[in-house]
């Protein structure tokens, strides 16, 4: 456990009942999303009701978009009057680890990058209802990042299908609701009903894909002559060029002339600047469909596999 780190105190109202206080005691290791990083916060600031906008409760994709605007924090202690949470972005910059409860239906392995997604699995409830305070705590599910990306991609596909339904295949597609991970069969029951979040995800996805495809094709057409010149000396480049690629064959047949760019005293040929920008942009394309990893599992002397329900020591993802 880390020491001497930034901690946020979430005040528990005095009117809480004993059963609700006991329910909060079992929330150690869960993750809450802070609207701002401050020393003092109210419990209502991290409750599910704080995500409601315009009187409408967000669905699964809406929660994902809201997660990106907030700061994840791991609950380290639950005291009678306050909850102590350690913000991942700030508190874990010091040396050490914090314990994260594995509430997912799959195991977390040492070294796994972990992403946080809303509850999406059948038969799984992560809500803690505090009747005396009229508040609900809906905790995210920590998942290995590859699994989280596949789940969110399926959710976006479901939303796109609802946005533009196919009359030939009415109803839901069962293949979108079932996936397999490490031999386990997982069923999705996520709520995707509001089209605003689907439109936001779809717009970002399409714009990024169009940019990446257009700029990437331009870079390939520009680099093909140089790759052909290197193919006689580099075996890897030669094998790469021997691949039956439509883009490669089209570039060899068409071989368009590179546009003559205006040069001035402070500007070089922007090919490599464009390549760097495209690589950075392509790397961000995956983050559009899922949250970036928040933490990484790091077990020192314990078991390398953390089962569902157990505590997993985690460090801040680099």
Curated annotation (Swiss-Prot):
<keyword id="KW-1048">Host nucleus</keyword>
<dbReference type="GO" id="GO:0042025">
    <property type="term" value="C:host cell nucleus"/>
</dbReference>
<comment type="function">
    <text>Structural component of the T=16 icosahedral capsid. The capsid is composed of pentamers and hexamers of major capsid protein/MCP, which are linked together by heterotrimers called triplexes. These triplexes are formed by a single molecule of triplex protein 1/TRX1 and two copies of triplex protein 2/TRX2. Additionally, TRX1 is required for efficient transport of TRX2 to the nucleus, which is the site of capsid assembly.</text>
</comment>
<protein>
    <recommendedName>
        <fullName>Triplex capsid protein 2</fullName>
    </recommendedName>
</protein>
<dbReference type="Pfam" id="PF01802">
    <property type="entry name" value="Herpes_V23"/>
</dbReference>
<dbReference type="InterPro" id="IPR002690">
    <property type="entry name" value="Herpes_capsid_2"/>
</dbReference>
<keyword id="KW-0167">Capsid protein</keyword>
<dbReference type="GO" id="GO:0005198">
    <property type="term" value="F:structural molecule activity"/>
</dbReference>
<comment type="similarity">
    <text>Belongs to the herpesviridae TRX2 protein family.</text>
</comment>
<dbReference type="GO" id="GO:0019028">
    <property type="term" value="C:viral capsid"/>
</dbReference>
<comment type="subunit">
    <text>Interacts with TRX1 and major capisd protein/MCP.</text>
</comment>
<keyword id="KW-0946">Virion</keyword>
């Amino acid at each position: 456990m880390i020491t001497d780190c930034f901690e946020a105190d979430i005040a528990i109202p005095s009117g809480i009942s004993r059963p609700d206080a006991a329910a909060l005691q079992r929330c150690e290791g869960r993750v809450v999303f802070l609207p701002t990083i401050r020393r003092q916060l109210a419990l209502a600031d991290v409750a599910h009701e704080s995500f409601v906008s315009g009187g409408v409760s967000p669905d699964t994709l809406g929660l994902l978009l809201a997660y990106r605007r907030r700061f994840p924090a791991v609950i380290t202690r639950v005291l009678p009057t306050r909850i102590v949470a350690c913000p991942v972005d700030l508190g874990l910059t010091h040396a050490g680890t914090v314990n994260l409860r594995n509430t997912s239906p799959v195991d977390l392995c040492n070294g796994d990058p972990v992403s946080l997604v809303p509850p999406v699995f059948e038969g799984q409830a992560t809500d803690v209802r505090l009747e005396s305070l009229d508040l609900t705590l809906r905790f995210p599910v920590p998942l290995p990042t590859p699994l989280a990306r596949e789940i969110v991609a399926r959710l976006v596909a479901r939303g796109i299908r609802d946005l533009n339904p196919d009359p030939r295949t009415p109803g839901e597609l069962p293949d979108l609701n079932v996936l397999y991970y490490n031999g386990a069969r997982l069923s999705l029951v996520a709520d995707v009903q509001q089209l605003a979040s689907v439109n936001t995800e779809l717009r970002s996805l399409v714009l990024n894909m169009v940019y990446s495809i257009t700029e990437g094709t331009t870079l390939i057409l520009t680099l093909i002559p140089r790759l052909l010149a290197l193919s006689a000396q580099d075996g890897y480049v030669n094998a790469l060029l021997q691949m039956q690629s439509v883009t490669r064959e089209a570039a060899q047949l068409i071989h368009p002339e590179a546009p003559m760019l205006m040069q001035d005293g402070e500007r070089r040929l922007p090919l490599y600047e464009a390549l760097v920008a495209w690589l950075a942009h392509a790397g961000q394309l995956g983050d559009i469909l899922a949250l970036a990893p928040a933490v990484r599992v790091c077990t020192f002397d314990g078991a390398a596999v953390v089962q569902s329900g157990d505590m997993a020591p985690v460090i801040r993802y680099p």
